[in-house]
């Protein structure tokens, strides 16, 4: 769908589509859903402005995206880092979408190079937590959100991102536990009424 001279678009997976164009994004979502594929929305913050007020059904607003995620199970996530970190809007929009879909419908974040030349390589990537390197395991990881995204500003291709092997969410204790190798730097608020934050550094083995 063309918006302001660019295509408001998504990536398709497991469908064999050859770049067909549709009159609306919903038509494209429905087509991929019928084929049993999956989709990730590309840099949606480009088409949304935090300075504008959107109705819950207005195109490109958080309510509109949230409704699409609830309607089409084929939509598994959206880019929150794109071509480095071009648009912080992507993450703000992601948060507003999650406020409308959680806890019944999760929406997973992804990081994409959006590579148009060699200089744009190696900054954005995702680790998929898979038992085996198979298509079925990749599909399963995408459906369940068993992955984490990374952004390396310099794009050296040698960034030392933590290697996380497992993530466990405990709904009762409201905790997230991970198994990983590497250094993790946590930043968290000290209390709900204060804007002050503390940081803790721990080595995870």
Each model region followed by its residue ranges:
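Residues that flank catalytic or metal-binding motifs in active/ligand-binding sites
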Residues: 6-9, 35, 74, 105, ...
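Anion (oxyanion) recognition and catalysis
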Residues: 33, 98-99, 103
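C-terminal functional module detector
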Residues: 101-108, 113-205
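Alpha-helix termination/capping residues and helix-transition junctions
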Residues: 69-72, 103
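Solvent-exposed residues in well-ordered beta-strands and their adjoining turns
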Residues: 58-60, 181
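A metal-dependent hydrolase metal-coordination microenvironment
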Residues: 1-57, 64, 73, 79-94, ...
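Short, exposed beta-strand/loop patches in secreted or surface proteins that constitute
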Residues: 20, 70, 165-169
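Generic recognition of flexible, low-complexity loop/linker segments
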Residues: 27-28, 66-67, 175-177
């Amino acid at each position: 769908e063309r918006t302001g001279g660019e295509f408001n678009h998504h990536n398709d997976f497991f469908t064999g589509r050859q770049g067909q164009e549709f009159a609306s994004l919903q038509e494209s979502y429905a087509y991929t859903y019928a084929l049993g594929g999956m989709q990730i929305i590309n840099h949606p913050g480009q088409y949304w402005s935090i300075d504008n007020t959107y109705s819950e059904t207005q195109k490109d607003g958080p309510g509109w995206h949230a409704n699409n995620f609830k309607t089409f199970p084929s939509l598994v996530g959206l880019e929150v880092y794109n071509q480095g970190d071009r648009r912080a809007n992507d993450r703000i929009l992601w948060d507003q979408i999650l406020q409308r879909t959680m806890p019944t419908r999760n929406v997973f974040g992804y990081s994409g190079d959006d590579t148009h030349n060699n200089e744009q390589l190696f900054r954005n990537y995702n680790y998929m937590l898979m038992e085996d390197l198979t298509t079925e395991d990749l599909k399963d990881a995408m459906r369940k959100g068993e992955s984490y995204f990374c952004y390396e500003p310099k794009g050296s291709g040698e960034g030392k991102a933590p290697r996380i092997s497992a993530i466990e969410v405990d709904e009762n204790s409201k905790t997230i536990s991970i198994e990983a190798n590497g250094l993790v730097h946590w930043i968290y608020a000290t209390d709900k009424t204060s804007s002050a934050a503390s940081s803790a550094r721990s080595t995870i083995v």
